[in-house]
Curated annotation (Swiss-Prot):
One MF annotation (Gene Ontology) recorded for this entry: potassium channel activity
Main location per the UniProt record: membrane
Domain RCK N-terminal: 120-246
Pfam families tied to this protein: Ion_trans_2, Slo-like_RCK
The organism of origin for this protein: Thermoplasma volcanium (strain ATCC 51530 / DSM 4299 / JCM 9571 / NBRC 15438 / GSS1)
Name of the gene this protein is made from: tvoK
InterPro entries the UniProt entry points to: 2pore_dom_K_chnl, K_chnl_dom, NAD(P)-bd_dom_sf, RCK_N, Trk_Ktr_HKT_K-transport
Result, substituting L115N: Abolishes expression of the soluble RCK domain
Membrane topology (UniProt): Multi-pass membrane protein
Alphabetized UniProt keyword annotations: Calcium, Cell membrane, Ion channel, Ion transport, Magnesium, Manganese, Membrane, Metal-binding, Nickel, Potassium, Potassium channel, Potassium transport, Transmembrane, Transmembrane helix, Transport
Superkingdom: Archaea
Full protein name: Calcium-gated potassium channel TvoK
């Protein structure tokens, strides 16, 4: 009984499909039109439509606008039937073509709901807004970790190398699982400012809910979140975020410092740009660094970078004490032309 029920469900799904309905209508027009043409032409003198197959051949020539002209109706009644076939058949064929295109497009959209291949240690960026594109552009290194964009709005996004798009909502556990949240190394939660369905004063609420959901599914993943209101930063940390950024706070502080420090804004922006010769990087202490003082590390790495800070257990050492011993798990912040050169130098 179970196979029979499954077959019934499949047939019901096929029957309810718009593509099936249009296709069946097209077949009916072809079969009925061919039969009427056959009836009107089989006894007409000089007519070449003497059997049903030839009538079908003529009908298909007509609806597909091929028009070989090898078979044509002779009588006036046959020509009237041919005109009806032209009007109904050609219209249905156009509708069928459009329906097939829409069906294939829908399949492509549905496939975006899941990754086509399994990823590990990737970065998931939740929500698409004006800043998301800049994040992708800044992480287009060939050896960079794969990026998965999880958003309801991905239709207008471009294709990038090593970037995958999953259509969904970052507050949904199922959608996060489709983006392989269990194996992700980090999650970046952008404010969903382009979602017109969410009032501006509730954007941070969605961000907090997203943090809760992500942390529930992966307790070890690094979560970087953006909030609109600086007051919600502590709530985001309580929800499980590793780092919390407020665009408004960054902008206001940068402008404030630039008033009495000419050139500071230009320096900071250039150090964060992908097009400049020097950039700010951070790297977890490994290789020769653990156990080494900041002074010795700066001396060993002088040819490839300038150490500007050390972050230990969330505490920022700036400027770092020259006698401070770098520990395992610390992060070293530096200025350099190329991060790979620093990584190679650290290996020893």
């Amino acid at each position: 009984m179970r196979p029979f029920r499954t077959l019934v469900k499949v047939l019901q799904k096929i029957e309810s499909s718009p593509l099936t309905k249009v296709f069946m209508a097209f077949i009916i027009v072809v079969l009925i039109g061919s039969y009427l043409e056959f009836l009107t032409q089989r006894n007409v003198k000089y007519s070449e439509i003497k059997n049903y197959f030839t009538a079908i051949w003529f009908t298909m020539e007509t609806v597909t606008t091929v028009g070989y002209g090898d078979v044509v109706p002779v009588s006036n009644l046959g020509r009237v039937v041919a005109m009806l076939i032209m009007v109904s058949g050609i219209g249905l064929l156009g509708t069928l073509t459009a329906t097939i295109s829409a069906y294939l497009f829908q399949i492509r959209i549905e496939r975006r709901g899941k990754l086509e291949k399994r990823l590990k240690n990737h970065t998931i960026i939740c929500n698409w807004n004006a800043y998301t594109r800049n994040i992708i552009e800044g992480n287009r290194d060939e050896e960079a970790a794969p990026i998965v964009i999880l958003s309801e709005n991905t239709d207008n996004s471009e294709k990038y190398q090593n970037v995958f798009f999953v259509k969904g909502d970052c507050t949904s556990e199922d959608d996060l699982k489709n983006a392989a949240i269990e194996d992700a190394a980090r999650v970046v939660i952008m404010s969903d400012i382009e979602n017109n369905a969410i009032p501006e004063d509730l954007l941070d609420a969605k961000t907090l809910l997203s943090i809760f959901t992500v942390r529930k599914l992966n307790n070890a993943v690094e979560i970087i979140a953006e909030v609109r209101d600086e007051k919600n930063k502590k709530h985001a940390v309580s929800a499980g975020a590793t780092e919390v950024l407020s665009v408004g706070e960054l902008s206001s502080r940068l402008i404030s410092r630039s008033i009495s420090n000419p050139g500071l804004t230009d320096f900071i922006l250039k150090s964060l740009s992908e097009t400049e010769d020097f950039k700010i990087f951070s790297i977890e202490a490994c290789g020769i660094l653990p156990g080494m003082t900041v002074k010795d590390a700066a001396s060993n790495l002088a040819e490839v970078c300038v150490i500007i800070s050390v972050i230990s257990k969330g505490k920022i050492e700036y400027p770092p004490d020259r006698s401070y011993k770098i520990g395992a798990g610390d992060y070293v912040v530096f200025l350099a032309k190329n991060k790979k050169e620093v990584e190679e130098a650290i290996k020893g």
